[in-house]
Amino acid sequence: MTTTKQSTFGATIRTTILMASLSGLLVVIGALISGGNPSTMLLFLGFALAINFFSYFFSDKMALAMSGAKPVTESEAPKLYEAVRELTARAGLPMPRLYVIPQDQPNAFATGRNPKHSAVAVTRGILNLLSDDELRGVLAHELTHIRNRDILIQSVASAIGAAITYIAYMLLWLGSDDNSPLALVGQLATFLLAPIAATIIQMAISRQREYAADAGGAEICGNPESLASALLRLEQGATAKPMQVNQAAEPLYIVKPFSSKGIAGLFSTHPPIEERVKRLRQMRPSLG
Protein backbone atom coordinates (compact mmCIF):
# COMPACT_ATOMS: atom_id res chain seq x y z
CA MET A 1 0.00 0.00 0.00
CA THR A 2 1.43 3.42 -0.96
CA THR A 3 2.01 6.18 1.57
CA THR A 4 -0.94 8.12 0.13
CA LYS A 5 -3.33 5.17 0.39
CA GLN A 6 -2.11 4.39 3.91
CA SER A 7 -2.75 7.98 4.99
CA THR A 8 -6.24 8.02 3.45
CA PHE A 9 -7.12 4.59 4.88
CA GLY A 10 -5.88 5.58 8.34
CA ALA A 11 -7.92 8.78 8.31
CA THR A 12 -11.00 6.82 7.21
CA ILE A 13 -10.61 4.30 10.05
CA ARG A 14 -10.16 7.08 12.62
CA THR A 15 -13.18 8.93 11.22
CA THR A 16 -15.28 5.76 11.50
CA ILE A 17 -14.24 5.28 15.13
CA LEU A 18 -15.01 8.92 15.95
CA MET A 19 -18.41 8.76 14.23
CA ALA A 20 -19.22 5.61 16.21
CA SER A 21 -18.18 7.39 19.42
CA LEU A 22 -20.40 10.35 18.59
CA SER A 23 -23.35 8.05 17.81
CA GLY A 24 -22.73 6.10 21.01
CA LEU A 25 -22.78 9.31 23.02
CA LEU A 26 -26.12 10.23 21.44
CA VAL A 27 -27.58 6.82 22.35
CA VAL A 28 -26.37 7.07 25.96
CA ILE A 29 -27.72 10.59 26.47
CA GLY A 30 -31.00 9.67 24.77
CA ALA A 31 -31.39 6.65 27.03
CA LEU A 32 -30.75 8.78 30.12
CA ILE A 33 -33.44 11.32 29.35
CA SER A 34 -35.98 8.82 28.00
CA GLY A 35 -35.57 6.32 30.79
CA GLY A 36 -35.34 3.70 28.06
CA ASN A 37 -38.70 4.73 26.56
CA PRO A 38 -38.56 3.76 22.84
CA SER A 39 -41.05 6.45 21.78
CA THR A 40 -39.00 9.23 23.36
CA MET A 41 -35.79 7.92 21.85
CA LEU A 42 -37.43 7.77 18.40
CA LEU A 43 -38.49 11.39 18.85
CA PHE A 44 -34.88 12.43 19.47
CA LEU A 45 -33.73 10.35 16.50
CA GLY A 46 -36.27 12.10 14.29
CA PHE A 47 -35.01 15.45 15.52
CA ALA A 48 -31.43 14.55 14.58
CA LEU A 49 -32.52 13.29 11.15
CA ALA A 50 -34.44 16.50 10.46
CA ILE A 51 -31.35 18.59 11.22
CA ASN A 52 -29.26 16.31 9.01
CA PHE A 53 -31.77 16.53 6.13
CA PHE A 54 -31.72 20.31 6.18
CA SER A 55 -27.91 20.43 6.43
CA TYR A 56 -27.46 17.96 3.59
CA PHE A 57 -29.68 19.74 1.07
CA PHE A 58 -29.11 23.39 1.97
CA SER A 59 -25.61 23.61 3.48
CA ASP A 60 -24.02 24.58 0.13
CA LYS A 61 -26.37 27.53 -0.38
CA MET A 62 -25.82 28.64 3.21
CA ALA A 63 -22.02 28.36 2.97
CA LEU A 64 -21.82 30.30 -0.30
CA ALA A 65 -24.16 32.99 1.02
CA MET A 66 -22.29 33.35 4.34
CA SER A 67 -18.95 33.71 2.54
CA GLY A 68 -20.24 36.28 0.05
CA ALA A 69 -19.05 34.07 -2.83
CA LYS A 70 -19.95 35.19 -6.35
CA PRO A 71 -20.21 32.95 -9.44
CA VAL A 72 -17.27 33.40 -11.80
CA THR A 73 -17.24 32.72 -15.54
CA GLU A 74 -14.44 31.14 -17.56
CA SER A 75 -13.76 34.44 -19.32
CA GLU A 76 -13.25 36.09 -15.92
CA ALA A 77 -10.97 33.35 -14.50
CA PRO A 78 -9.56 31.25 -17.36
CA LYS A 79 -6.63 29.79 -15.34
CA LEU A 80 -8.97 28.72 -12.55
CA TYR A 81 -11.27 26.94 -14.99
CA GLU A 82 -8.35 25.34 -16.81
CA ALA A 83 -6.87 23.97 -13.59
CA VAL A 84 -10.18 22.66 -12.25
CA ARG A 85 -11.08 21.06 -15.59
CA GLU A 86 -7.73 19.22 -15.70
CA LEU A 87 -7.95 18.07 -12.08
CA THR A 88 -11.57 16.89 -12.30
CA ALA A 89 -10.62 14.81 -15.34
CA ARG A 90 -7.79 13.20 -13.37
CA ALA A 91 -10.05 12.60 -10.36
CA GLY A 92 -12.97 11.29 -12.42
CA LEU A 93 -15.31 14.00 -11.13
CA PRO A 94 -17.85 16.25 -12.87
CA MET A 95 -17.01 19.94 -13.18
CA PRO A 96 -18.13 21.82 -10.04
CA ARG A 97 -19.60 25.31 -10.04
CA LEU A 98 -16.87 27.88 -9.42
CA TYR A 99 -17.07 30.95 -7.19
CA VAL A 100 -14.77 33.76 -6.11
CA ILE A 101 -14.98 35.29 -2.63
CA PRO A 102 -14.13 39.03 -2.61
CA GLN A 103 -11.68 38.72 0.31
CA ASP A 104 -7.95 39.43 0.41
CA GLN A 105 -7.15 36.53 2.74
CA PRO A 106 -5.95 33.53 0.68
CA ASN A 107 -8.37 30.67 1.33
CA ALA A 108 -10.75 28.24 -0.36
CA PHE A 109 -13.48 25.72 0.34
CA ALA A 110 -15.67 23.11 -1.35
CA THR A 111 -19.32 22.43 -0.65
CA GLY A 112 -22.26 20.50 -2.07
CA ARG A 113 -24.16 17.36 -1.13
CA ASN A 114 -22.52 15.14 -3.78
CA PRO A 115 -20.14 15.40 -6.77
CA LYS A 116 -23.00 16.27 -9.14
CA HIS A 117 -24.14 19.14 -6.91
CA SER A 118 -20.81 20.61 -5.83
CA ALA A 119 -19.09 23.97 -5.80
CA VAL A 120 -15.56 25.23 -5.19
CA ALA A 121 -15.03 28.76 -3.90
CA VAL A 122 -11.66 30.54 -3.79
CA THR A 123 -10.85 33.96 -2.43
CA ARG A 124 -9.49 36.80 -4.50
CA GLY A 125 -6.43 36.65 -2.24
CA ILE A 126 -5.57 33.06 -3.12
CA LEU A 127 -5.69 33.80 -6.85
CA ASN A 128 -3.28 36.70 -6.36
CA LEU A 129 -0.87 34.91 -4.00
CA LEU A 130 -0.25 31.35 -5.16
CA SER A 131 1.71 30.04 -8.10
CA ASP A 132 -0.12 27.92 -10.68
CA ASP A 133 1.23 24.69 -9.16
CA GLU A 134 0.31 25.74 -5.62
CA LEU A 135 -3.20 26.67 -6.73
CA ARG A 136 -3.56 23.26 -8.39
CA GLY A 137 -2.59 21.63 -5.08
CA VAL A 138 -5.27 23.59 -3.22
CA LEU A 139 -7.92 22.82 -5.84
CA ALA A 140 -7.01 19.12 -5.75
CA HIS A 141 -7.47 19.18 -1.96
CA GLU A 142 -10.94 20.69 -2.36
CA LEU A 143 -11.90 18.21 -5.07
CA THR A 144 -10.90 15.38 -2.73
CA HIS A 145 -13.40 16.70 -0.17
CA ILE A 146 -16.04 16.42 -2.90
CA ARG A 147 -14.91 12.94 -3.97
CA ASN A 148 -14.85 11.70 -0.35
CA ARG A 149 -18.31 13.21 0.33
CA ASP A 150 -16.90 15.01 3.34
CA ILE A 151 -19.77 17.49 3.30
CA LEU A 152 -22.14 14.58 4.01
CA ILE A 153 -19.88 13.27 6.79
CA GLN A 154 -19.69 16.70 8.42
CA SER A 155 -23.46 17.18 8.07
CA VAL A 156 -24.13 13.90 9.87
CA ALA A 157 -21.59 14.71 12.59
CA SER A 158 -23.07 18.18 13.07
CA ALA A 159 -26.61 16.78 13.24
CA ILE A 160 -25.65 14.23 15.89
CA GLY A 161 -23.72 16.88 17.83
CA ALA A 162 -26.71 19.24 17.76
CA ALA A 163 -29.00 16.45 18.95
CA ILE A 164 -26.65 15.63 21.83
CA THR A 165 -26.60 19.26 22.94
CA TYR A 166 -30.40 19.50 22.71
CA ILE A 167 -30.91 16.28 24.66
CA ALA A 168 -28.44 17.39 27.34
CA TYR A 169 -30.46 20.57 27.85
CA MET A 170 -33.66 18.51 28.00
CA LEU A 171 -32.11 16.24 30.61
CA LEU A 172 -31.29 19.20 32.84
CA TRP A 173 -34.64 20.97 32.56
CA LEU A 174 -36.98 17.96 32.53
CA GLY A 175 -35.02 16.04 35.12
CA SER A 176 -35.91 12.48 36.09
CA ASP A 177 -37.96 10.64 38.69
CA ASP A 178 -34.82 10.14 40.77
CA ASN A 179 -34.30 13.30 42.84
CA SER A 180 -31.39 12.01 44.90
CA PRO A 181 -28.29 14.23 45.16
CA LEU A 182 -26.28 11.69 43.15
CA ALA A 183 -28.83 11.74 40.32
CA LEU A 184 -28.87 15.53 40.28
CA VAL A 185 -25.08 15.63 40.09
CA GLY A 186 -25.21 13.16 37.20
CA GLN A 187 -27.74 15.29 35.34
CA LEU A 188 -25.64 18.42 35.82
CA ALA A 189 -22.47 16.63 34.69
CA THR A 190 -24.26 15.36 31.58
CA PHE A 191 -25.56 18.84 30.81
CA LEU A 192 -22.06 20.32 31.08
CA LEU A 193 -19.87 17.58 29.65
CA ALA A 194 -21.92 15.93 26.89
CA PRO A 195 -21.96 18.96 24.54
CA ILE A 196 -18.23 19.51 25.15
CA ALA A 197 -17.45 15.87 24.39
CA ALA A 198 -19.61 16.01 21.25
CA THR A 199 -17.82 19.14 20.05
CA ILE A 200 -14.37 17.63 20.65
CA ILE A 201 -15.35 14.52 18.65
CA GLN A 202 -16.82 16.64 15.83
CA MET A 203 -13.61 18.66 15.60
CA ALA A 204 -11.52 15.48 15.58
CA ILE A 205 -13.61 14.14 12.67
CA SER A 206 -13.02 17.40 10.80
CA ARG A 207 -9.26 17.15 11.35
CA GLN A 208 -9.16 13.58 10.04
CA ARG A 209 -11.05 14.62 6.91
CA GLU A 210 -8.48 17.37 6.33
CA TYR A 211 -5.64 14.86 6.51
CA ALA A 212 -7.46 12.60 4.05
CA ALA A 213 -8.11 15.53 1.68
CA ASP A 214 -4.43 16.48 1.81
CA ALA A 215 -3.42 12.93 0.88
CA GLY A 216 -6.00 12.69 -1.89
CA GLY A 217 -5.16 16.15 -3.19
CA ALA A 218 -1.48 15.26 -3.38
CA GLU A 219 -2.36 12.17 -5.39
CA ILE A 220 -4.66 14.03 -7.80
CA CYS A 221 -2.25 16.87 -8.56
CA GLY A 222 0.74 14.52 -8.49
CA ASN A 223 2.93 16.89 -6.49
CA PRO A 224 2.63 16.87 -2.67
CA GLU A 225 5.18 19.69 -2.42
CA SER A 226 2.86 22.06 -4.29
CA LEU A 227 0.15 21.59 -1.66
CA ALA A 228 2.66 21.70 1.21
CA SER A 229 4.08 24.99 -0.07
CA ALA A 230 0.57 26.38 -0.57
CA LEU A 231 -0.46 25.51 2.99
CA LEU A 232 2.53 27.35 4.44
CA ARG A 233 1.77 30.44 2.39
CA LEU A 234 -1.94 30.26 3.20
CA GLU A 235 -1.24 30.11 6.93
CA GLN A 236 0.95 33.21 6.66
CA GLY A 237 -1.74 34.94 4.64
CA ALA A 238 -4.47 34.04 7.13
CA THR A 239 -2.41 35.59 9.93
CA ALA A 240 -1.55 38.72 7.96
CA LYS A 241 -5.04 39.29 6.55
CA PRO A 242 -7.78 38.22 8.97
CA MET A 243 -11.14 37.37 7.43
CA GLN A 244 -14.56 37.81 9.00
CA VAL A 245 -16.08 34.33 8.85
CA ASN A 246 -19.24 32.91 10.36
CA GLN A 247 -18.04 30.26 12.83
CA ALA A 248 -20.41 27.69 11.32
CA ALA A 249 -18.56 27.96 7.99
CA GLU A 250 -15.05 27.79 9.45
CA PRO A 251 -14.59 23.99 9.02
CA LEU A 252 -15.10 24.31 5.26
CA TYR A 253 -11.95 26.33 4.58
CA ILE A 254 -8.62 24.73 3.69
CA VAL A 255 -6.89 26.67 6.49
CA LYS A 256 -8.44 28.23 9.57
CA PRO A 257 -9.38 31.85 8.87
CA PHE A 258 -8.21 32.68 12.41
CA SER A 259 -5.77 31.00 14.79
CA SER A 260 -6.41 28.96 17.94
CA LYS A 261 -3.69 27.88 20.34
CA GLY A 262 -3.32 25.96 23.58
CA ILE A 263 -6.40 24.13 24.82
CA ALA A 264 -8.38 25.73 21.99
CA GLY A 265 -6.54 23.30 19.72
CA LEU A 266 -8.83 20.54 21.01
CA PHE A 267 -11.71 22.45 19.47
CA SER A 268 -9.86 23.25 16.25
CA THR A 269 -11.47 22.10 13.02
CA HIS A 270 -8.06 21.90 11.31
CA PRO A 271 -4.85 20.00 12.13
CA PRO A 272 -1.67 22.05 12.72
CA ILE A 273 -0.21 23.23 9.42
CA GLU A 274 3.24 21.95 10.36
CA GLU A 275 1.85 18.42 10.80
CA ARG A 276 -0.04 18.59 7.51
CA VAL A 277 3.10 19.75 5.71
CA LYS A 278 5.18 17.02 7.38
CA ARG A 279 2.77 14.32 6.20
CA LEU A 280 2.68 15.69 2.67
CA ARG A 281 6.46 15.76 2.43
CA GLN A 282 6.60 12.15 3.60
CA MET A 283 4.48 11.26 0.55
CA ARG A 284 6.98 12.62 -1.94
CA PRO A 285 8.87 9.32 -2.48
CA SER A 286 5.65 7.39 -3.19
CA LEU A 287 4.35 9.94 -5.70
CA GLY A 288 7.56 11.13 -7.19
Task: Walk through the language-model features, giving the residues of each.
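Hydrophobic alpha-helical transmembrane segments of integral membrane proteins
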Residues: 187, 191-192
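Polar-ligand-bearing catalytic/cofactor-coordination segments
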Residues: 1-21, 36, 40-42, 47, ...
